């Protein structure tokens, strides 16, 4: 035998062994009952020497069921956020141009920016004289004396809305990918809707928590010197309590109390804060009592949690923080986030925290922010909740951490920290999303139909195997061996790349098996023709493969092009069919041209060999 034959044998054996190895997780996955396949029971059942447990064959929504969520993106909120950032940018732009102004604010329902200045004309000329701003906005007039307004063009607002939906879809896709759900179907629908299908996932509450969470991380400076909230003492009752904390439950109307806060200039003061039993109660107090006292361009009220109690048994209440309105820094600058254990010498020591790392630009901005606000409290606000508000004791640049509320067991805190780290890494949604539809979907086909379909496929495959042996005898048996390896190889590749097997995917799989059989039929018929022409067995096999090679390649490549087009322009089930088809075609060429030839050359290695064909 030639040396090249031994190399080809080694290749075939290696491919077969690797395919079996790759399918080990799938073997353990399908051995378990359906309700245990996506749990720790599966993770612990896979041997340590096997591939990663996540590399197993997955069944699609039509075969195993799952969760379907439809989410609406609040594009108007996204526009307001974008306009508010533009207002801050215009302020920085005017400072850079040394143009005098007294302030910027968002007006006109969140779609216009108003700049107050002694000379509004100078502000208008500076802003609209800049190419970047003149392409986006114009001055509609209607501003009060001593101010000028800038409105965004309709095309720009439309672009803001479209980008908000696209960014939301991208963020949701990133979260699902980091979550480990394989082959989700995520697509944008009409009316700013995004539909998400999660095959095999059975926990709708966890899905809503991770996908629906906005994950807007903001850093704001506390305005502890401002006594404006002291006025609420005449409108609300005082909270009752002692040195151990507040006496719960609190009045339904909310109540006020004081907390000592350090001042940047030295010393301290008793700052007023408002507390309530629930977030809903506190939000009502803020809307009715506190917001009328504030200038919304200067201050906002943040909501955080407090705990009362000793040891592991604690009761949560909700409290206010008076913050500056301006968001100094956002989570857009976070490069990475992970769960860690607090090592500080505080009550948080040993508890899970979310550590994060800023991007280079974020590190520069954080360093500037902390250096300018020494001895002030900096609130970390995640989705409108103040997670922590420590004092800035030194300059912070690239690394930071978010502490979590106490009063819960360690596992709950780990789960929350994992969820926060995941959404921070995947990015924040550009605007809040609301769940408009939620369904736990059962398998479309049902267990009985799946069983019957599987039985039909196996019976059909068995008939093909028997036919090949009866009609082609020895060479038919070789073709059957190649067919088995073909199926093994296709399933192994699908499990390795995380492809989900759907009903259309099964159709693609069966089609490629049929093409593999067809290729072997062409080879066997060609070998017969060469033997009828008087050539010996060895020559017939060699010429048979050589002369049918391009016919097989041509048919497979033509179908492969069609599969690529379907994958590129199709979606959902069509892409599933295309992926399986492409993998199967490549495997079919390998088994038909390489595997069967290696076996045939072994049995016909002598000129006097006989062949049953």
Swiss-Prot record:
GO MF, one example: protein-transporting ATPase activity
Membrane-spanning intervals of the chain: 10-30, 452-472, 477-497, 503-523, 548-568, 576-596
Subcellular location: Cell inner membrane
Pfam families in alphabetical order: SecD_1st, SecD_SecF_C, SecDF_P1_head
Keyword Cell membrane: yes
An example Gene Ontology biological process: protein transport by the Sec complex
InterPro entries: Acrflvin-R, SecD, SecD/SecF_arch_bac, SecD_1st, SecD_SecF_C, SecD_SecF_C_bact, SecDF_P1_head
Membrane protein topology class: Multi-pass membrane protein
Keyword Lyase among UniProt keywords: no
GO cellular component terms attached to this protein's record: plasma membrane
SUPFAM superfamilies per UniProt: Multidrug efflux transporter AcrB transmembrane domain (SSF82866)
Organism domain of life: Bacteria
Principal cellular location given in the protein's record: membrane
Assembly: Forms a complex with SecF. Part of the essential Sec protein translocation apparatus which comprises SecA, SecYEG and auxiliary proteins SecDF-YajC and YidC.
Described purpose of this protein according to its UniProt entry: Part of the Sec protein translocase complex. Interacts with the SecYEG preprotein conducting channel. SecDF uses the proton motive force (PMF) to complete protein translocation after the ATP-dependent function of SecA.
Protein name, UniProt field: Protein translocase subunit SecD
Organism: Anaeromyxobacter dehalogenans (strain 2CP-C)
């Amino acid at each position: 035998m030639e040396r090249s034959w031994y190399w080809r044998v080694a290749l075939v054996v290696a491919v077969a062994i690797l395919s079996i190895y790759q399918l080990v997780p799938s073997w353990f996955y399908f051995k378990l009952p359906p309700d245990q396949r996506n749990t720790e029971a599966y993770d612990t059942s896979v041997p340590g020497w096997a591939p990663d447990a996540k590399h197993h064959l997955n069944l699609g929504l039509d075969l195993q069921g799952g969760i379907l969520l439809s989410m609406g993106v609040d594009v108007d909120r996204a526009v307001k956020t974008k306009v508010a950032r533009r207002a801050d940018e215009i302020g920085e732009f005017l400072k850079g141009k040394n143009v005098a102004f007294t302030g910027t604010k968002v007006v006109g329902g969140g779609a216009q920016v108003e700049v107050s200045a002694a000379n509004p004309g100078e502000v208008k000329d500076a802003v609209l004289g800049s190419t970047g701003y003149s392409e986006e906005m114009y001055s509609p007039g209607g501003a009060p004396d001593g101010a000028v307004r800038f409105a965004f063009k309709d095309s720009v607002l439309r672009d803001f809305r479209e980008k908000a939906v696209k960014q939301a879809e991208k963020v949701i896709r990133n979260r699902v990918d980091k979550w480990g759900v394989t082959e989700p179907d995520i697509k944008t629908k009409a009316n700013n809707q995004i539909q998400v299908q999660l095959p095999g996932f059975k926990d709708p509450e966890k899905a809503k928590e991770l996908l629906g969470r906005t994950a807007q991380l903001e850093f704001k400076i506390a305005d502890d010197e401002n006594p404006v909230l002291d006025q609420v003492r005449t409108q609300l009752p005082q909270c009752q309590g002692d040195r151990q904390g507040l006496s719960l439950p609190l009045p339904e109307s909310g109540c006020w109390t004081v907390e000592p806060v350090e001042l940047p200039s030295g010393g301290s003061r008793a700052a007023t804060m408002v507390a309530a039993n629930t977030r809903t109660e506190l939000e009502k107090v803020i809307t009715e009592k506190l917001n009328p006292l504030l200038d919304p361009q200067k201050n906002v009220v943040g909501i955080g949690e407090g705990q009362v109690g000793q040891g592991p048994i604690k009761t949560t209440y909700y409290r206010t923080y008076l913050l500056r309105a301006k968001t100094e820094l956002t989570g857009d600058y976070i490069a990475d986030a992970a769960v860690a254990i607090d090592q500080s010498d505080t009550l948080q020591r040993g508890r899970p925290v979310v550590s994060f790392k800023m991007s280079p630009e974020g590190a520069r901005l954080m360093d500037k922010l902390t250096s300018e606000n020494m001895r002030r409290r900096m609130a970390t606000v995640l989705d409108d909740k103040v997670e922590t508000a420590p004092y800035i004791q030194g300059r912070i640049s690239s690394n930071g951490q978010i502490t979590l509320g106490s009063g819960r067991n360690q596992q709950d805190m780990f789960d929350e920290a994992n969820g926060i780290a995941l959404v921070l890494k995947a990015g924040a949604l550009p605007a809040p999303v609301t769940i408009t539809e939620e369904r736990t979907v059962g398998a479309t086909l049902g267990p009985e139909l799946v069983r019957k379909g599987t039985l039909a496929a196996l019976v059909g495959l068995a008939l093909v195997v028997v036919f090949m042996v009866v009609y082609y005898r020895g060479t038919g048996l070789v073709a059957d061996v190649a067919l088995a390896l073909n199926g093994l190889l296709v399933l192994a590749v699908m499990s390795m790349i995380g492809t989900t097997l759907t009903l259309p995917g099964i159709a693609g799989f069966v089609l490629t098996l049929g093409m593999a059989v067809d290729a072997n039929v062409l080879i066997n018929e060609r070998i017969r023709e060469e033997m009828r022409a008087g050539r010996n067995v060895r020559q017939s096999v060699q010429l048979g493969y050589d002369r049918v090679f391009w016919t097989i390649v041509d048919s497979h490549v033509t179908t492969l092009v069609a599969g690529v087009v379907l994958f590129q322009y199709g979606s959902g089930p069509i892409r599933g069919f295309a992926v399986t088809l492409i993998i199967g075609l490549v495997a079919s060429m390998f088994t038909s041209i390489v595997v069967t030839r290696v076996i045939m050359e072994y049995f016909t290695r002598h000129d006097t060999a006989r062949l049953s064909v």
